[in-house]
Amino acid sequence: MAVQQNKKSPSKRGMHRSHDFLTAAPLAVEPSTGEVHLRHHISPNGYYRGKKVVKTKND
């Protein structure tokens, strides 16, 4: 059975647990289309910050 060699202090225990809780992804709303997408990514329609930057299949 595995046994720890040294006791982990409360501070180190907290640092170890600090990444256990997930946060919601930061979402942004495209001003021209109203579509929701990840921040700093283009929307599925090819818009970024209100401007068309990528041609899509429908264009």
Swiss-Prot record:
Coiled-coil intervals, chain numbering: none
Highest rank taxon of the organism: Bacteria
Region (Disordered) residue spans: 1-23
GO cellular component, one term: large ribosomal subunit
Signal peptide: none
Keyword Ribonucleoprotein: yes
Family, as annotated: Belongs to the bacterial ribosomal protein bL32 family.
NCBIfam families xrefs: rpmF_bact
Protein name stated in the entry: Large ribosomal subunit protein bL32
